[in-house]
Curated annotation (Swiss-Prot):
One of its GO terms (biological process) is glycerol transmembrane transport. This is Major facilitator superfamily transporter mfsA. It comes from Aspergillus fumigatus (strain ATCC MYA-4609 / CBS 101355 / FGSC A1100 / Af293). Gene3D superfamilies: MFS general substrate transporter like domains. The gene is mfsA. One of its GO terms (cellular component) is membrane. Belongs to the major facilitator superfamily. Sugar transporter (TC 2.A.1.1) family.
């Protein structure tokens, strides 16, 4: 079992775990930005002539090349989907760090295949195979890293860390855009091979971190390895394995694990329509990932440089610069989410995001209806406004919301379904965007604008506010809505924050299974978010 900490403990160990996680998510964003810059690179299309758009293409030629471009780009998402599925079925058995090491290793193999593919015979096929293999590795990592980091971190900073991981996706995109721009003057295939190969550096850092850092205490407890769990907890906290602090956290994890086991479910449990509303809550959790993709984020990220050049008719050099500026704005715009996610709340941020993104794309499509130089500038403004709103709203929210909205017994299934929804919708959007943009440069933005407004309506009626709520309170909200015949968001608005005693009382009145002995032990151990934070802050000061 991997309990090694490489001599690190306390703050240094926690920072090392965070660093490895951050690099892993940066790699996710790096690939998005890399392909955005490569697709219109001279040497890239010379190496893969099938991707080169002729000067005066016929409608058939343009359609064919758009299909190939979409397939070459979106095949990565298909690999990610299967990697996430593998993690869902094998993750608990293999462990967090083992799975991350496997994912990083597979990603390295895929990056090598893509980097060294030779031209002249089936070159696109080689490139696609490499991207699919890389995607499998990335899918394994993106499904596992947040769990590993969350289980190794304190209760009070988990929401912040999810936002930080989202910011690092944008950070990876930022790095990729400027790397591609910086090497765009190279006169041979190094112009595209170097950015592709640079993925290997990120993956090596992640793989090294997985080898040198411990698995999560929660995973050890789930496998019955209590001594190892206490050993790792002691290292993370910077104290001895038998200290009061370690025993407190160990008992907390043990209690939560027993609660989860007592609520074990299968897929049949998901299709529950009574007071607990499992199926409705599963769909709501998945809807965030659906709307994240179908409101246009990856259409803008993957194809921004191409859109600047082909749809907005900018010169190639200027389109590369605009792509870099676009990525810089994207990265910087994630910063407000760190402060707003708790203060503003999930529901309001969702609505702000849908409205802002929709209006941004309205500006873009309206400016593209009649193509002029001035209108192109207005269209570019719309794209920049879109990515600004997206960065602090729909980038982090779909990753935070599913674990909060789903009940305990379907939380694992709900999180897995949400992740798979993301990758499948990602694949679909990245595949059809170049086809749609080729047929109607303004129509594609109208399409995404309409989906944003659909999301605004859906979010208003179906998203309840979970910020500051205990997970048991969300169960009460849906049960009260079912009993009283009200919309859950109205119940959540009218229901004040409940104390532990009020949660138990209302759960009994509503006929919910409260698992009293588990809840009492949670209270004793300080498992609620507020008390856990207070306890951890006390220990941090010692």
């Amino acid at each position: 079992m991997w309990t090694t900490t490489s001599g690190l403990s306390g703050r240094s160990l926690r920072l090392s775990i965070t660093f490895a996680a951050v690099v892993g998510f940066s790699l996710f964003g790096y690939n998005q930005g890399m392909m955005a810059g490569l697709l219109n690179g001279d040497e890239f299309v010379n190496s893969f002539p099938i991707l080169k758009m002729p000067d005066n293409p016929t409608a058939g030629e343009k359609h064919y090349i758009d299909v190939i471009r979409g397939a070459v780009t979106s095949c990565y998402e298909l690999g990610c989907f299967f990697g996430a599925l593998f993690s869902m079925f094998c993750g608990n058995r293999l462990g967090r760090t083992r799975l991350i090491f496997m994912g990083a290793s597979i990603l390295i193999v895929g990056a090598l295949l893509t980097t060294v593919c030779y031209t002249g015979k089936w070159e696109v096929g080689q490139f696609v195979i490499g991207r699919v293999v890389s995607g499998i590795g990335n899918g394994m990592n993106t499904a596992t890293i947040p769990v590993w980091q969350s289980e190794c971190s304190g209760a009070h900073n988990r929401g912040f860390l999810v936002c930080f991981e989202g910011a690092m996706i944008a950070g990876g995109t930022f790095i990729a855009y400027w790397v591609v721009f910086g090497i765009s003057h190279a006169a041979d295939s190094v112009q595209w091979r170097f950015p592709v190969a640079l993925q290997i550096f990120f993956a090596l850092v992640v793989a090294t971190g997985a080898l040198m850092l411990p698995d999560s205490p929660s995973w050890f407890v789930s496998r019955g390895l209590d001594n190892e769990a206490c050993e790792v907890l002691g290292k993370i906290k910077g104290t001895s394995p038998d200290s009061d602090q370690v025993l407190h956290d160990f008992n907390l994890i043990k209690t939560d694990m027993e609660s989860t086991k007592s609520e074990q479910s299968n897929w049949k449990t998901v299709f529950t329509f009574g007071k607990t509303q499992e199926f409705q809550r599963l769909l709501i959790g998945c809807s965030g990932q659906f709307f994240q993709q179908f409101t246009g984020c990856n259409a803008a990220i993957y194809y921004s440089t191409l859109l600047f050049q082909e749809n907005l008719h900018m010169e190639k050099y200027l389109s590369l610069i605009m792509g870099g500026v676009f990525a810089s704005v994207y990265a910087l715009a994630t910063i407000p989410s760190f402060f707003m996610i708790e203060r503003v709340g999930r529901r309001k941020l969702y609505l702000i995001g849908f409205l802002g993104q929709g209006l941004s794309f309205v500006i873009t499509f309206a400016c593209l209806i009649k193509e002029t130089e001035e209108n192109s500038k207005g269209a570019a403004v719309g794209i920049f406004l879109f990515i600004t709103f997206f960065a602090f709203t729909l980038l982090p929210l779909p990753w935070i919301y599913p674990p909060e909205i789903n009940p305990l017994r379907t939380r694992t299934v709900g999180a897995s379904a949400s992740t798979c929804t993301n990758w499948m919708c990602n694949f679909a959007v990245v595949m059809f965007t170049p086809l749609f943009a080729g047929q109607s440069p303004w129509g594609v933005y109208l399409f995404f604008a309409l989906f944003n407004f659909v999301g605004l309506i859906f979010g208003y009626f179906f998203y309840v506010e979970t910020a500051g709520r205990e997970l048991e309170e969300v169960d009460i909200i849906y049960a009260k809505a079912h009993v009283e015949g009200k919309m859950p968001f109205r119940v959540a608005h009218d229901l004040p924050k409940l104390s532990f005693e009020e949660i138990v009382q209302q759960s009994r009145e509503l006929g919910l299974d409260t698992n009293d002995h588990v809840m009492l032990e949670k209270k004793e151990l300080g498992l609620s978010s507020d008390s856990a934070q207070e306890t951890e802050e006390v220990y941090e000061k010692q």
